């Protein structure tokens, strides 16, 4: 389990780089209890995935950052990694399968990442990414 101290540490690291997204009460979901929705769709990349990507990249040493990062994604994680990498001046490569729609690939490229289309599905793209991870050039996000 992740400790509260680790959560606070991550929050402190990523805070300067993220949007603060609101909690909104949901009438529909609050029938028997109070339910609030965290509107991460208002985040800079449109999802919560940016938070984890930023925390990981901000945790890398300068030496690790200099080698670049790789990730496998079908969309939002890739956008988060691409945005975080661009923000920090880190080269990023996102592996995607041929099943991923072109607009998702373009969105990630627009954020500055190199996109490699490999395999017919996410499992195959993941396998290919591991072959690149064994090279002394990348950290996996």
Give residue ranges: language-model regions.
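Single conserved hydrophobic/aromatic residue that forms the stacking wall/gate
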Residues: 132-141
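PLP-dependent amino-acid enzyme catalytic core
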Residues: 1-133
């Amino acid at each position: 389990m992740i400790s509260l101290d680790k959560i606070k540490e991550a929050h402190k690291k990523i805070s300067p780089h993220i949007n603060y997204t609101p909690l909104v009460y949901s009438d529909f979901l609050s029938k028997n209890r109070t339910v609030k929705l965290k509107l991460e769709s208002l985040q800079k990349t449109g999802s919560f995935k940016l938070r984890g990507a930023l925390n990981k990249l901000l945790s890398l040493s300068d030496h690790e950052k200099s080698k670049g990062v790789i990730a496998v994604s079908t969309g939002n994680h890739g956008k988060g990694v691409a945005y975080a990498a661009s923000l920090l001046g880190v080269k990023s490569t996102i592996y995607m399968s041929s099943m991923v729609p072109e607009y998702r690939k373009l969105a990630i490229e627009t954020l500055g990442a190199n996109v490699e289309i490999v395999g017919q599905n996410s499992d195959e793209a993941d396998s290919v990414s591991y072959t690149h991870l064994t090279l002394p050039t990348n950290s996996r996000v």
